[in-house]
């Protein structure tokens, strides 16, 4: 499975400020620019909700955990995250 690394700065923006194919490139860019924020590893070509289920990190227990609102807002502590 392929992954990308997404950086979201510590400011008030809701959107990421950079996307990288390699963690080393992300860390270098963050260091060079003295940034603070979170770098998270995301799988490519699979919804996060489905990824968590396929990897046994999450099992929906009822319809509320399977509806559109749950899927579009899904997040997991199992995503690899680095703080800067």
What are the language-model segments listed below?
Residues 10-12, 23, 42-47:
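Generic structural motif
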Residues 32-84:
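Short, mixed-charge low-complexity intrinsically disordered segments
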Residues 1-16, 25, 35:
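Short aromatic-glycine-(Arg/Gly/Cys) micro-motifs in beta-strand/loop hairpins
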